[in-house]
Amino acid sequence: MTVSNASYLKTFYDKTVAHGAKVISSDFTLEIEGFEDYWLLCKQAPWPELSSQGEIEIPTPLGSMMYQPQQIRTAQQGQISFYETVVGDIDNLMLELITQSGAYSGARSTFNCKIYEGTPEKYLRYKRLIDCFVQLDTVDRDWENRTQPLMVQGTMFFHYFGETVEGNSSDYN
């Protein structure tokens, strides 16, 4: 085990503190446009980031190679989870999303949403996701599970083009 002296460790502490406070994963909300009252029921959602889709291998002389980046990945996906209510709010929400008109001619069930760092009332920033849809997993119910609310989970597919809007709060207060 390495034992470093305190002054050496203090340099790492000081450099880490200089970067500022870290974002806490739980400090988010997801608000679906047209269904703004449901934001308190979303427990988990994907946080979009722009990056390359991957690498392109470029052969070079003498059996060598190099990489260059692929196009930016704007079509993304990630896990989403909702708390169901006794009146079936999420069940009804999914039915509404399926039957509403989408962005494409004749397409159905796409929606736009905002994912906030904070809440819709007080936030550091939000990112706008467009042409989203959700593929839900089959919900498992269990007679022995008396300790957890019913979770409806699945995958949200969406497009993100880097649209980030600065917020109205510096600390959610």
What spans do the regions from the language model cover?
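Protruding loop/beta-arch "assembly-hinge" segments enriched in small, turn-prone residues
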Residues: 7, 151-153, 157-173
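Broad hydrophobic/π-residue packing in well-ordered secondary structure
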Residues: 22, 26, 75, 93-98, ...
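Extended serine/threonine-enriched, polar tracts that run as long, contiguous segments within proteins
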Residues: 112-123, 128-137, 142-146, 158-161
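Glycine-rich loops and low-complexity Gly/Arg-rich segments
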Residues: 69, 104-108, 139-142, 152-162
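Residues within well-ordered beta-strands of beta-sheet-rich folds
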Residues: 79-81, 114, 155-157
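Acidic, glycine-rich loop-and-strand cores that form catalytic or ligand-binding grooves
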Residues: 88-126
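Solvent-exposed edge beta-strands and adjacent loop segments
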Residues: 1-88, 131-151
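Short C-terminal domain-edge/linker segments immediately following a structured domain
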Residues: 58-62, 109-115, 144-148, 163-169
